[in-house]
Each structure stands twice: as structure tokens, then as C-alpha cells.
């Protein structure tokens, strides 16, 4: 995998990374001039760990215009986000190979939430639940952070402000996943196959998704040719029929379902 950027309205994507290791985008910097991404590429001679690229990934930063990536931290992590001030990273750790989508388990590899002060390089573990704590995102204004936890039995959203926690969702049947937050404090997440948005102190609502095409390939759509035939002719042996549909010539068997 490599990192690309493109306008939300569609258009040509710009490739930012070219390394043979998988590069996974995480966040934009507050000034929108750089992208944070995780990669298992070598971090330099100070890192003496010999690890699998599937497990520990380092956090890098690269300009949205391209260029050489810059290493930010060698700590193995995932789901990394940067705050509005650009001086703190919040992330979930990655202790082992346990499936990210496994539910209702407690073990030595369940994920926890950490913060990294980019000025002091200090790491602080925030979560204490023995099960899964996942996908942290900063609340706008640096007042707190949201994250997913299974402490209620199923993954739900919690708001943490200075150690005081407030439950935001209360689902029981299925887990909440893919959490993000906008600058106006509107949450976005998936639940039971649908995409939801939830403004602060309001109810969640499912939304319709329209995906923009990047314009590199023609759009494809499966169409039936059993109707709309304009001309046809029977073959001399009576076994095939040639016909025209939407300006294209097709041949179909009289007995059978094969059409070319």
C-alpha cells in the first residue's frame, strides 16, 4: 500500500509514498500541509528491534505535495491522531497478532489508549480496562478525546475529559467501529453495516453515501440485453439469433442461456 491524496470532489490522485512496505494514512496535520502515516520500513540504527512488519509500525509525516517522509516515533502503534495544537499524538497500542475485529475477549494483547507528547517525547497510558479500548480521536478544542471501549459488553463511544468519562452511545447488539470526529464536534462511525453521524449532545442518524470517481477509468454498470432490442436475424441453421442492443451486436443461442 502507498499513500495518495485527492480532492473530495474527485480528480486525479497524487502519490506521496513509494516504499515497498505498506504505508497506511492516519491523519492530516492541523495546517493540512502534511499527512501522518504508519509504515513498517526500517527506522534507523537506533532501533534494535527485529520485528514483523505486520506487528510494529512506525509513525511518519510527509508533505501533501510529496517529498521525503520524516520519522515521528518508532513506537509500535495504530489508529494515530494528532491534536489541534499539533503537539500531541493519541493512539492505540499493538501488542500482538490478535484480530482487530475479535469481540468480547480479555487477554494480554487487547489494545489500550496512549498519548505521546511531541515536545517532551513522553508516553502516557490512559486506558485501564482489561478488554479492548480502540480508535481514539481528539475532541475539537483539545478538551478531551473520544474512544471505543468494550467495558459495557459491546464497543461503544466514550468521551474522556480530564479523566472523567461520559458514555456517548449505548448499543448492545453490535459493535461501533471506524470512529472519527469533525471540527464542529460531529461524530461519524459505522454500526451494523450503516454509516452514522452524531452531532454533540444529539441523536445519531444514518446517512446516504455517494462515492466520487477519481476519473482514471470509465464507470461500469451491468445492464440486461433481454429488452430494448432494435434489430435481429435468425441464423441459417436456426440455432442462434444475432441482435442489436444499445448499438452493440450480440449472438445468443436459441436453446440455452449463453449470449456473446
Regions found by a protein language model. Give the residues of each.
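Residue-level detector of Asp-centered blade-edge/turn motifs that repeat once per structural unit
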Residues: 30-31, 84-85, 140-141, 182-184, ...
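Conserved beta-strand position repeated across blades of beta-propeller domains
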Residues: 27, 81-83, 137, 179-180, ...
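A flexible loop/linker signature enriched in serine peptidases of the S9 family
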Residues: 1-4, 17-24, 33-60, 64, ...
Amino acid at each position: 500500500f502507498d499513500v495518495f491524496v485527492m480532492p473530495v470532489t474527485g480528480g486525479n490522485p497524487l502519490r506521496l509514498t513509494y516504499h515497498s512496505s505498506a504505508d497506511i494514512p492516519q491523519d492530516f496535520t492541523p495546517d493540512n500541509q502534511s499527512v501522518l502515516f504508519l509504515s513498517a520500513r526500517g527506522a534507523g540504527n537506533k532501533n534494535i528491534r527485529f520485528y514483523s512488519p505486520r506487528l510494529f509500525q512506525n509513525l511518519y509525516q510527509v508533505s501533501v505535495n510529496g517529498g521525503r517522509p520524516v520519522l515521528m516515533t518508532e513506537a509500535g502503534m495504530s489508529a494515530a491522531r494528532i491534536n489541534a495544537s499539533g503537539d500531541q499524538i493519541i493512539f492505540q497500542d499493538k501488542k500482538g497478532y490478535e484480530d482487530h475485529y475479535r469481540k468480547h475477549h480479555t487477554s494480554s494483547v487487547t489494545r489500550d489508549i496512549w498519548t505521546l507528547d511531541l515536545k517532551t517525547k513522553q508516553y502516557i497510558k490512559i486506558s485501564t480496562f482489561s478488554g479492548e479500548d480502540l480508535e481514539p480521536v481528539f475532541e475539537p478544542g483539545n478538551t478531551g478525546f473520544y474512544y471505543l471501549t468494550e467495558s459495557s459488553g459491546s464497543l461503544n463511544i466514550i468521551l474522556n475529559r480530564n479523566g472523567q468519562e461520559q458514555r456517548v452511545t449505548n448499543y448492545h447488539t453490535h459493535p461501533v467501529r471506524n470512529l472519527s470526529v469533525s471540527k464542529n464536534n460531529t461524530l461519524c462511525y459505522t454500526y451494523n453495516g450503516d454509516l452514522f453521524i452524531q452531532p454533540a449532545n444529539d441523536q445519531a442518524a444514518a446517512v446516504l453515501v455517494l462515492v466520487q470517481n477519481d476519473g482514471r477509468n470509465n464507470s461500469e454498470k451491468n445492464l440486461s440485453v433481454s429488452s430494448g432490442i432494435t434489430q435481429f436475424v435468425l441464423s441459417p441453421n436456426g440455432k442462434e439469433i444475432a441482435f442489436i442492443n444499445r448499438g452493440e451486436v450480440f449472438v445468443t443461442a436459441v436453446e440455452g442461456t449463453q449470449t456473446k
